[in-house]
Amino acid sequence: SSMSIIKVQEYLKEDGSSPYQEWFNSLDVQAAAKVTVAKSRLELGNTSNVKWFDGIGEYKIDWGPGYRIYLAQDGKQLIVLFGGGTKKNQQSDINRAKELYQEYKRRKKEISKEQATDNDNRDKR
């Protein structure tokens, strides 16, 4: 098929917490169900609902208070989730996602340096 499977993962901060999961856990059952469907669409490569702002994607769910999922695409095969919100807090949610995205990119650089030296050990684990 033309749509490729994309890996969708939550961004984990250095303390291991997931801003996306914290937001998701605050949703009621119906909203959580809508968000779960949206996430599975992303996994199928369906990004037609995503609007982009400076590298941050906003997946809009046309339901209830207008839920949004904030994400970034890292290459073709990976989408990173930074959190979500409603239309009401859109601007602050976008700003927060941008900060997390910068942090993600910075840490990814550091990790790839470490991995270069760590590759031999990893195979034996």
What do these predicted ranges mean?
Residues 1-66, 75-79, 86-125:
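Basic, Lys/Arg-enriched alpha-helical interface segments
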